[in-house]
Swiss-Prot record:
This is Nucleotide-binding protein Dtpsy_2240. InterPro entries: DUF520, UPF0234-like_C, UPF0234_N, YajQ-like_sf. Belongs to the YajQ family. Pfam families: DUF520. One of its GO terms (cellular component) is cytosol. Nucleotide-binding protein. It comes from Acidovorax ebreus (strain TPSY). The keyword DNA repair does not apply.
C-alpha cells in the first residue's frame, strides 16, 4: 500500500552555516563595534546576546535574513523572551523545532480522519505516517495538510508505492 511520512525537520548544516554567517556579520558591522552582541549555536538552540532589546532584535533580524538566504524556513524558530544576564546585558534563546510534537501530530491525524479519504494516519514518534490504497488519495492528503497546517514547515518524505 502506498504511504508517506509527514515530518518537520530543519537542515542543521544550513542552520549552522547561517549562525556562522550571522556571527561574521556582527563582527564586521560598525554599529556592533564595542558591544557584547553575539550569536551561538549549541545542539538545537541558538543563543543571541546583546546590550539592549534593540540590539537583540537586530541580531535576530540578521539571523532570520541569513536563514532565509540558505532556504531554511524561519517557522522552525521558536523565539523565547529575552533574559537579563550580568550587568546590563541580555540573552535570548531561540529553539530550532525538530519533529512534530504530539499535539500537532494528533491534529494532523484528526484532519485526515475527518477528510473522508480512505487513509490511515499513524503517529510514529516525531512524524506521522499516512497510508492509503490510492496514490491520488495520498496526494489529496498532502494538499489538505499543507493548506490546514500552515504554522509548521512540514515536508513529506519516504514516499512508498
Amino acid at each position: 500500500m502506498p504511504s508517506f511520512d509527514t515530518v518537520c525537520e530543519a537542515n542543521f548544516v544550513e542552520v549552522k552555516n547561517a549562525v556562522e554567517n550571522t556571527a561574521k556579520e556582527i563582527g564586521t558591522r560598525f554599529d556592533f563595534k564595542g558591544t557584547s552582541a553575539a550569536v551561538e549555536l549549541k545542539d538545537k538552540e541558538i543563543t543571541l546576546f546583546g546590550d539592549a532589546d534593540f540590539q537583540l532584535q537586530q541580531v535576530e533580524d540578521i539571523l532570520r535574513n541569513k536563514l532565509t538566504k540558505r532556504n531554511v524556513d524561519v517557522r522552525f524558530l521558536d523565539v523565547q523572551k529575552p533574559q537579563k544576564i550580568g550587568g546590563d546585558k541580555l540573552k535570548q534563546v531561540v529553539k530550532v523545532k525538530n519533529g512534530i510534537d504530539s499535539e500537532q501530530a494528533k491534529k494532523i491525524q484528526r484532519l485526515i480522519k475527518d477528510s473522508k479519504l480512505k487513509l490511515q494516519a499513524a503517529i510514529q514518534e516525531d512524524k506521522v505516517r499516512v497510508t492509503g490504497a490510492k496514490r491520488d488519495d495520498l496526494q489529496a492528503a498532502m494538499a489538505l495538510i499543507r493548506k490546514d497546517i500552515a504554522d509548521l514547515p512540514l515536508t513529506f518524505d519516504n514516499f512508498r508505492d
